[in-house]
């Protein structure tokens, strides 16, 4: 009996020591307790169909039941979905770390603009109007552009800058990670022709839907961050966008570092984007 009791106490003590060591190892990580992740379907009147999105609330949303919070919209790339970011990155920890609501909508293969040829792909209206209105009416968010940001990867980087540059009254801050910011350089890729038409016969439409060609319309005031890797196939067009913004005297952050068109790069880059937005929200 004494041997059994001693063995039990030893196992209990060892378990407590293991737990203590584990707790020390994660002491610097964000503790996520009350965070809520919703998967919602938002009805688009423009497209006459529902579009899904993931909404991530921070712990603070529950700790402070009367407070409102900034919102960050995070867009996926081509061939992706609204599930990509929550699957690849701990968005709950990010939401709690910065005290923000994060929204990851489905963009299908839309390039996040309103297609001039396909009424079922009107994603600029969805992102910049219908989705924002839904989020602001269902969650405790600040309803002004200063406290609203948008970013994304690849096609989503294009979409984030496209929507922000065209709607500065909606998004006060914006970012891009490995963004396809000049679609005219890639006329036979990623179903873009299904959204605008064949490049050879619709060159003007392609030019009008390229982010880089929006630069002459911009005014200083938005907080802009652009991020890409040296080994990315979008590296050159991002450098061109950086130069265009400099020539137009539009303030922005531009980061180039080792990396390619990979999730390894984006899951690292999102941390810098979120820090940038947090500083903008605090101004």
Which residues make up each language-model segment?
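Bacterial Sec-dependent N-terminal signal peptides
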Residues: 1-27
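Non-catalytic cap/lid and distal C-terminal segments of serine-dependent acyl enzymes
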Residues: 22-283
């Amino acid at each position: 009996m004494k041997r059994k009791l001693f063995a039990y106490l030893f196992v209990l003590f060892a378990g407590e020591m293991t737990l203590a060591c584990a707790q020390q190892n994660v002491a610097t990580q964000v503790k996520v307790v009350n965070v809520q992740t919703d998967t919602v379907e938002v009805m688009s009147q423009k497209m006459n169909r529902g579009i899904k999105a993931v909404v991530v609330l921070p712990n603070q949303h529950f700790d402070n039941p009367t407070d409102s919070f900034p919102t960050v919209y995070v867009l996926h790339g081509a061939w992706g979905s609204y599930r990509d970011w929550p699957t690849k990155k701990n968005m709950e920890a990010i939401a709690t770390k910065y005290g923000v609501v994060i929204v990851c909508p489905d963009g299908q293969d839309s390039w996040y603009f309103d297609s001039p040829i396909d009424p079922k792909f009107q994603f600029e209206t969805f992102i910049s109007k219908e989705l924002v209105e839904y989020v602001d009416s269902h969650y405790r968010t600040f309803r002004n552009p200063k406290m609203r940001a948008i970013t994304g990867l690849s096609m989503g980087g294009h979409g984030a800058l496209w929507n922000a540059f065209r709607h500065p009254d909606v998004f006060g801050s914006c970012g891009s990670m490995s963004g396809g910011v000049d679609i005219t350089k890639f006329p036979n890729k990623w179903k873009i022709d299904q959204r605008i038409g064949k490049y050879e016969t619709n060159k003007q439409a392609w030019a009008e839907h390229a982010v880089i060609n929006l630069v002459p319309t911009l005014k200083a005031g938005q907080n802009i961050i652009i991020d890409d890797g040296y080994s990315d196939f979008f590296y050159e067009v991002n450098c061109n966008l950086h130069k265009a913004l400099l020539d137009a005297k539009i303030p922005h952050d531009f980061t180039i570092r080792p990396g390619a068109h990979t999730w390894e790069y984006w899951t690292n880059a999102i941390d810098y984007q979120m820090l940038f937005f947090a500083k903008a929200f605090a101004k």
